[in-house]
Amino acid sequence: MEYNTSALCDIYLDQVDVVEPMFSNFGGCASFAGQITTIKCYEDNGLIRETLEQDGLGRILLIDGGGSLRRALIDAELAALAEENEWEGIVVYGSVREVDELEEMSIGIQAIASIPVGATSQGIGEVDIPVNFGGVTFLPEDYLYADNTGIIISQEPLSADLGEEEEDELL
């Protein structure tokens, strides 16, 4: 399904938080949405792997990597694992690598930057805790909507199906 964060903001602006514009799209799906599972880790992707091994249908993995530009938390192997387990997308407050392979995958991936250096895999970090970056506090189970324009979150699901009347009002 396609999501348009601009249209969603036009309708639901008082119900959503808008993440500061710092992310770029690295995955094969330009838009994605779902309930978030949070991970807080720094230059270590062990917990990320454990989480992506779970069923991700309807879910987005939101990773607070401390904004690190030194090591990539997501690579092609982890993205393939996410795709295999039906995750809707991954948002990384940090870096990714193997970007040519990532853009061929049927999963949404947004991150700050890319770097060829991989992360360690010791499993250090925390899962399903509130995290804060981009001017927004993300709570486990919040709903996240992302496209090439930006990322927004809501405590409640938003209708992506705009009726004709609503579409006419937006024009």
From Swiss-Prot:
Protein name: Regulator of ribonuclease activity A
HAMAP family for the chain: RraA
Keyword Oxidoreductase recorded: no
Protein's organism: Vibrio cholerae serotype O1 (strain ATCC 39315 / El Tor Inaba N16961)
Family annotation (PANTHER family): 4-HYDROXY-4-METHYL-2-OXOGLUTARATE ALDOLASE 3-RELATED (PTHR33254), REGULATOR OF RIBONUCLEASE ACTIVITY A (PTHR33254:SF29)
Gene Ontology MF terms in the entry: endoribonuclease inhibitor activity; enzyme binding
Source species taxonomy: Bacteria, Pseudomonadati, Pseudomonadota, Gammaproteobacteria, Vibrionales
Gene Ontology CC entries for this record: cytoplasm
Quaternary structure annotation from Swiss-Prot or TrEMBL: Homotrimer. Binds to both RNA-binding sites in the C-terminal region of Rne and to RhlB.
